[in-house]
Amino acid sequence: MSFRLLIFAHDLRFTRLWRGNYTTSSHYWGQMIVGDLKPLEEIVSAIKEYKQILVLGCGSCVTVCLSGGEKEAEQLCHELSKVRHYEGAPPKFEMGCILRQCEEDLVHEYQTIPEGTDAILSLACGAGVQTVADAHDPLPVIPALNTTFLGASAKPGIWAEMCRGCGDCVLTYTGGICPVARCAKSLFNGPCGGSQNGSCEVGLDTPCAWAMIYYRLKRQDKLHLLDEIRAPKDWRPGGAGGPRKRIRLGLGEGKSS
């Protein structure tokens, strides 16, 4: 049940910020993405085939909402290390945490993949999972959270949409590439007839998400995931049931009476 702790952060003041004033932290980043831990059974099912897994926390939004930071990654490592979750021996786990998984420069500069790692279990939002998956292709990157909803950012610049906070993350089965956000039609059964030579019909400069998914899974030797029959997607966690709200008992107005 032991695991090794790896910290990837370039400034210790951020660690104090994460565990200090959460309001200040949220304001500092100028954005807020909320995620919920996936059911433990789903996580175990996704990782049981691997032998050595890096559980990777993210020190930004999901730390603020108490879902995917250093502390939560450590707790998940402890729980997943328990033999009772597996038919055979459990995988070996190592834990790390970087400042932001959604920034490619930080992922490359401050993240070291331990030797022998055959999968990464990411506690980031969907954008972070995909950034790590792109950086370490073809190493499988598995989401441990369901990204639920996204706040606004007023920062200048350009951002590429990678996640829509559908609340039912499927990146485990699509090679770390989101069909909801990155397919123009949010298709779940492969490319449409308008896809040509790896490009989407909306424009040659827009890659076809399903072409990317296919070739990513091919590099991972996991094309069999495309043959599996899955239940229709549940869109209710994505906001189809009305505006969403997260409550953490014991914090501010969410304090239990």
Predicted features, each with a name:
Residues M1-M95, D105-I120, D134-Y173, I177-S257:
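Iron-sulfur (Fe-S) cluster-binding modules
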Residues R100-Q101:
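Membrane-embedded and interfacial regions of multi-pass energy-transducing membrane proteins
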Residues S122-G126:
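N-terminal glycine-rich "phosphate-gripper" loop used for MgATP/nucleotide binding
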Residues G128-T131:
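Short, well-ordered alpha-helical microsegments
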